[in-house]
């Protein structure tokens, strides 16, 4: 048998910690081992894209572009790879062609060599702009075909999609098995067909989850696959990829030997084991719920997100119901593969169906957009009843979705204004307006607002930072400590024009073990209302879920409603950002808005009062 070295892409810096550690590894934790990783001889290092962009801005207070530059500066021999969601880029909706082109250009300039591009629906129209931009930048366009199991996803379907992508100029193909559903013998059939029909390298990306992936890799290797994805052992298994060390060992002495240095791999693993222990992060394990992926087909990473979402809603005990609801919703909307952003869209709809007790009563904007065709063509037929219920008489579009995107990069450049110091800042804002604006405000305030000695915490707004600075950080810290140690629930500090309120967080409401009423599992927050609201019989609109309250769809535009406005029943009042999606909240009565009871950008609890409306 002719020797054929198998290439290995290491996912440690991107998908591995996204899958197991909620994408919380910091750039500083990667730095000490980058040169060691560079010397291994990997086919590529996947280090950017996916959820890492959002997580840097939202949770780590880091600039994702700076992370890429830092990695590039320390990795000189190994190609750097990113995951790009086609027309979604690294976000959760479609962006205009000019934004896609500029994003690809800047990613290439900052260090990306290989762009793995996929579309959640395998709609090849959503590859076109990114593919052309990658080619123009002189970089490698790897087209990924998303694998799933459904009545409409056949072997011929995958070959047809792959053929269109090769015609588009793909330099290589990847089969993306995000849910670990690809069985060893089906992989053999699929890879054999791909190698027979297309003269481009084939890569296979599998998650471990239920444990099939190592066997699937071996059968795929025998069938001719060229490259596989793995992760260092502290970040392998469970929702992540198989361990690099295990796969390398399995191939030693075979015609497929990867020729990677095991001792160097173990040194890398020892370092990341230290990072894991310091971060308090878990190893990848396979639970019964994960093993049941072969039944419910919900990817492990999606299960982790669902668990997090339900904890936020104080309804973790409802997970089994949500897992039962997901396949039902998926079938109703045409069997989309459960990969970002469709995993969030379908999963969130299932959560809302279960927690509200009324199926399709609350529908996020993203689900509405999907049903309109704004993400692309559904793989299978969509339930006409669902379309009518959500869209009414509106018909789904038939053109390429990006052709209807109105916002341009220049529009966002004007919105963000002087907060943006470079095109990268404008792109971050275009993808995540609220999150990026908050980040840019924190980092462009200047050292005079650096009230905690290094950097203000991410949860402080610019106004709060200024107020704390004027009041004195040490005094604020002392007051916080005093409130925490006392029976006080709230203390107000006033000095001159500065007023700071320190308030204890209420304990989480208890959740009954038996599940209780479907619509009231999470205890509602019944905050005291003002006398004007109580005495005038105003209708109170409350938060139907835990989330972040926004009065407008973008920081630069007017609120949906203001005090004194007349609203109709069903009219949008605000947006609640929950479970990574934007959910429009409509008024359930017609009347006049008398009070807005929550601050813009504030975290709100289930049942918290948001608006007081005088019924018409």
Predicted feature residues:
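Active-site beta-loop-alpha junctions enriched in small/polar residues
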Residues: 11-14, 18, 50-52, 83-89, ...
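Terminal or standalone catalytic/regulatory effector modules within metabolic enzymes
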Residues: 36-56, 287-290, 297, 301-475
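Active-site beta->alpha loop and helix N-cap motifs at the rims of alpha/beta catalytic domains
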Residues: 49-161, 173, 183
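Catalytic alpha/beta core domains of metabolic enzymes, predominantly
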Residues: 178-360
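Acidic, compositionally biased tether/linker regions
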Residues: 445-542
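Structured functional modules or segments
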Residues: 518-616
